[in-house]
Amino acid sequence: MITFPNAKINLGLNITEKRPDGYHNLETVFYPIPLEDALEITILNDSKQKFVLHQSGLEISGEPETNLVVKAYLLLEQEFQLPPVDIYLYKHIPSGAGLGGGSADAAFMLKLLNEKFNLHLADEKLEEYAAILGADCAFFIKNKPTFAEGIGNIFSPVDLSLKGYQLVLVKPDVFVSTRDAFSQIQPHYPDHSLKEIIRRPVSEWKNCMFNDFEKSVFPQYPVIEEIKKELYSKGAIYAAMSGSGSSVFGLFSPEEKITKMDFEAAFCFQTELK
């Protein structure tokens, strides 16, 4: 049984306050995009092992036990005594890009196990399991445009469709640590919530919807800022960094026919949103 975990982009990201536990509260809008990994599971005949992880595509660092798809399997295996499985993961979503690739893989693994082994878990229960694995994992259970607050784990639906818009996503060959991204952040409450801004026409977003991480990331990694500028120079009506980086995306008008774009030494994904 196979499934295709998809990435997300952040539309706006406001860091609103630092919490007593050291984390930060924020508000953002998660929007699913059709950049996908591939994830398949089959029954493992060798019952001496609980799982075997087969990885291909983009390189993933770390031991198999640290991979979120494995953690998702072990979470439900412990609860429901699942049989051993072969896990095949093909990575197309870049890691460390602010695209939620690992979280998507984990959430889709929960959904895949639920279907394959007839666990009859409702979405709400799957979201509870997903939240154990990561703050934004639960978003990928329903996988619809969502306003997120808290530490990115409190969700409410957003009535938003970008159907027809052209998306160009670029990830340079740099890694942004979360610590670096937070290093220059001054938490603040914006004058207008993203819940309000997201209802405005996309053509107005450039001047009112921002990613707070850009203030600290751009000075440290100028190549990321240059990509954003280049997307605007090529005609994007809105461009921003996703999450804490290092990917940047541009939205182009449905009426504009754009050609294949190339960015030197960078991963580039281009599609029409459905």
UniProtKB/Swiss-Prot annotation:
Catalytic activity, EC: 2.7.1.148
Taxonomy, superkingdom: Bacteria
Residues forming the catalytic site: 8, 136
MF GO annotations: 4-(cytidine 5'-diphospho)-2-C-methyl-D-erythritol kinase activity; ATP binding
UniProt KW keywords: ATP-binding, Isoprene biosynthesis, Kinase, Nucleotide-binding, Transferase
Keyword Nucleotide-binding in record: yes
Binding site for ATP: 94-104
Reactions this protein catalyses: 4-CDP-2-C-methyl-D-erythritol + ATP = 4-CDP-2-C-methyl-D-erythritol 2-phosphate + ADP + H(+)
Pfam families named among the record's database cross-references: GHMP_kinases_C (PF08544), GHMP_kinases_N (PF00288)
GO biological process: isopentenyl diphosphate biosynthetic process, methylerythritol 4-phosphate pathway; terpenoid biosynthetic process
InterPro entries found in the cross-reference section: GHMP_kinase_C_dom, GHMP_kinase_C_sf, GHMP_kinase_N_dom, IspE, Ribosomal_Su5_D2-typ_SF, Ribsml_uS5_D2-typ_fold_subgr
Pathway annotation: Isoprenoid biosynthesis; isopentenyl diphosphate biosynthesis via DXP pathway; isopentenyl diphosphate from 1-deoxy-D-xylulose 5-phosphate: step 3/6
Keyword set includes Transcription: no
Protein purpose: Catalyzes the phosphorylation of the position 2 hydroxy group of 4-diphosphocytidyl-2C-methyl-D-erythritol.
Family per similarity comment: Belongs to the GHMP kinase family. IspE subfamily.
Record-given protein name: 4-diphosphocytidyl-2-C-methyl-D-erythritol kinase
Naturally occurring in which organism (per UniProt): Bacteroides fragilis (strain YCH46)
Organism ancestry: Bacteria, Pseudomonadati, Bacteroidota, Bacteroidia, Bacteroidales
Gene that encodes the chain: ispE
